[in-house]
Amino acid sequence: MARRRDELEDTFMYAVKEIYYTLQGEGAQTGRAAVFCRFAGCNLWSGREQDRATAICQFCDTDFADTNGPGGGKFASAEELADAIAAKWRDPAFPSPEIGTRDTHNAGPSTPAARAASAQEPGSFREFVVCTGGEPLLQLDADLIAALHDRGFEIAIETNGTIEALPGVDWICVSPKAGAQLKQRSGDELKLVYPQAGADPAAFEDLPFRHFLLQPMDGPQREENTALALKYCLEHPRWRLSLQTHKLIGIP
């Protein structure tokens, strides 16, 4: 089983599947430009198809095994990884030729100090990184949080909630999984893949989150699951429907 960064030996390297620039495709931040840093490894599934049937999470639709994706690799320090993430924002070759490439002439200040200062200006925006996986909290640590903040980034995580987030994370999205103990019980959004046997949305409604979202489970029953999620949101208006828009428009 994967271990947390602070439980590993001094020779630990951040293992990252891929780093890329795109739009957030789901949840409360849908449509927002972001650098995605997908960490390798998860504590609810190995990422190998031969293990799926015995995994706690059997419906994962993400390839997070190994470090062989675009921009991926092993990074020896938080500074090195933060630089790799910042480079994707400064010079983002948008990965979908059908959509086009982003104009980098208006990409914003080019140095960490200038970017951090500009984020404080009225009407400005902060560069945005989404730490995802796999399970990002197996590796995201205080050093990396500090290094990303030094470069002006707002930090979001997409977590299964089985590990408590460290201080300094700016946006916490928890996606609970049936059969896994929920330890991160507060945050900005709770995004529940629906339907899940053993994960009733009503069981999470008293938790202190700002946004509650139902996301239809992908796969062969996607249309049926979408109809069920739509019906639930109409009957329980606290919940909002989250669609995977990146899949609909063909971007990562």
What are the residue ranges of the model-derived segments?
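S-adenosyl-L-methionine
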Residues: 23-34
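Short, intrinsically disordered, charge-biased short linear motifs at domain edges
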Residues: 27, 38-49
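Conserved AdoMet/S-adenosylmethionine-binding subsite of the radical SAM
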Residues: 124-128, 137-252
